[in-house]
């Protein structure tokens, strides 16, 4: 990621700096902006929210969490989000502002579904809401060479 990659006159580096983001283990940059003070019976917060930014060439590596995750598009280029329930049957959606082109401003990834994302331009800023709250203890990052295996046809 570098200053040469711009969207609406702002580079990904500048957006990262202005929002106080830090590198995320799955790729991209993030900052937790909210963690609900209410907890469930196990003491886990009921929800959490982050900013998440992917720049040109950044990939949110294949991963899954044990909770529903809502992706909310905020700014920048559209985002390609690919989800896969069982390691075989995947679907891709584009998050963004161009509703006529089929983009949508949000998408829900069900609990335990595999997911990966990339920016379709210079950079993309999304928010991710997880309920119950995100916890790295309940986060699984796929091995670097893991890919879904289509049953009949290509991904």
Locations of regions flagged by a protein language model:
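Non-catalytic, conserved peripheral segments adjacent to functional cores
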Residues: 2-108, 116-117, 121-124, 128-155
């Amino acid at each position: 990621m570098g200053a040469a990659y711009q969207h609406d006159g702002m580079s990904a580096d500048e957006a990262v700096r202005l929002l106080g983001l830090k590198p995320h283990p799955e790729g991209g940059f993030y900052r937790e902006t909210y963690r609900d003070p209410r907890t469930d019976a196990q003491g886990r917060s009921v929800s959490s929210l982050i900013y998440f930014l992917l720049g040109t060439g950044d990939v949110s590596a294949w991963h899954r969490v044990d909770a529903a995750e809502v992706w909310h598009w905020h700014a920048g280029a559209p985002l390609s989000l690919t989800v896969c329930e069982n390691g075989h049957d995947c679907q891709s959606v584009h998050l963004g502002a161009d509703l006529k082109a089929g983009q949508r401003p949000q998408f829900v990834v069900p609990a335990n579904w595999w997911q990966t994302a990339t920016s379709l331009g210079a950079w993309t800023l999304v928010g991710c809401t997880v309920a119950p709250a995100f916890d790295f203890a309940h986060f699984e990052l796929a091995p670097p060479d893991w890919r879904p295996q289509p049953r009949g046809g290509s991904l």
